[in-house]
From Swiss-Prot:
Null mutant phenotype: Mutant is unable to grow on nitrate, but grows normally with nitrite or ammonium as the nitrogen source.
Domain ABC transmembrane type-1 positions: 84-267
GO molecular function annotations of the record: nitrate transmembrane transporter activity
Name of the protein described by the UniProt record: Nitrate import permease protein NrtB
Membrane topology: Multi-pass membrane protein
The species this protein was found in: Synechococcus elongatus (strain ATCC 33912 / PCC 7942 / FACHB-805)
Family: Belongs to the binding-protein-dependent transport system permease family. CysTW subfamily.
UniProt-listed Gene3D superfamilies: MetI-like (1.10.3720.10)
Subcellular location: Cell inner membrane
């Protein structure tokens, strides 16, 4: 009788693949090193001065941007952690205003076919305007860079919220409306028991799109005119043009993506908690 011995590496690899707790992480473990290796090779071809590789980015930004992300030397000389917090404060104000206004307006348009049809061309035109196109006129109106940046967030984020809220109301099944008529539900009971539960998934779909657009808008707006913020940090590093500027920009871009992903997941998580469909 012969016994086939498997190499230890093969055993470990098989255990990794079959382990239900580790298997979901396998694509990341495989793909991330490949991505970093390709990035390092491209960097070597183009030159570290043009595109720093991952090793150089970490080495050039380790102190203070990675180790001390919340340092504050006064003025706009702050760590990336503080710069992100400045941007998040602006996003929070603009996004919350857009959410409240968008849900209210979308609810009115969804319940009134006349207003919904009449204002649809206006909404479709305005929602296609790029965020930065609003910045000059907001500066002329508000005469303040911070308020203008918040307005850009608001005007960028509001449209998907309005549209999805209105669509959600229009998609309420006819059976639900027929039951409401048969039971002679009051307006209040109809809104609480039929309209809101049926519309919540659509509203959060709009909120999820809106938070991504809001984060994109603030980064771009801060590059044009702002005192602090992650967008300001990126543009300031570009204008500085020092040896570590490229590494600082790449690190900031990584943080921008990480925060954007976190905001998206946060809104999606809240939506799953609130939505009756997910229960």
């Amino acid at each position: 009788m012969t016994v086939t011995l498997r190499p230890p590496s093969s055993v470990r690899r098989s255990a990794w693949v079959k382990n239900p707790k580790l298997k979901p992480f396998l694509p990341y473990v495989v793909c991330l090193p490949i991505f970093l290796a390709i990035w390092q090779v491209i960097s070597a071809i183009l030159g570290q001065d043009r595109l720093p590789g991952p090793i150089n980015v970490v080495a050039n930004t380790w102190m203070p941007y990675i180790v001390e992300p919340f340092f504050d030397n006064g003025g706009t000389s702050k760590g990336l952690g503080l710069q992100i917090l400045i941007s998040l404060q602006r996003v929070a104000i603009g996004y919350l205003l857009a959410a409240c206004t968008g849900i209210l307006v979308g609810g009115v348009l969804g319940m009134s076919k006349f207003l919904g049809k009449g204002l649809d061309p206006v909404i479709q035109v305005l929602r296609t305007v790029p965020p930065l196109a609003w910045f000059p006129i907001s500066l002329m109106v508000f005469q303040d860079a911070n308020t203008s940046a918040i307005f850009v967030i608001f005007i960028t984020a509001i449209w998907p919220i309005i549209i999805n809220t209105a669509v959600g109301i229009n998609q309420i099944p006819d059976d639900y409306n027929n039951v409401a008529r048969v039971l002679k539900l009051s307006k209040k009971d109809y809104i609480l028991n039929i309209l809101i539960p049926s519309t919540v998934p659509y509203v959060f779909a709009g909120l999820r799109i809106a938070v991504g657009l809001a984060w994109l808008a603030i980064v771009a707006a801060e590059m044009l005119k702002a005192d602090g913020g992650i967008g300001y940090f990126i543009w300031d590093a570009y204008n500085a043009g020092g040896d570590g500027s490229s590494s600082q920009i790449i690190l900031a871009i990584f943080y921008v993506g990480l925060v954007g992903l976190s905001l998206d997941r946060l809104v999606a998580w809240v939506g799953r908690l609130v939505s009756p469909v997910s229960r």
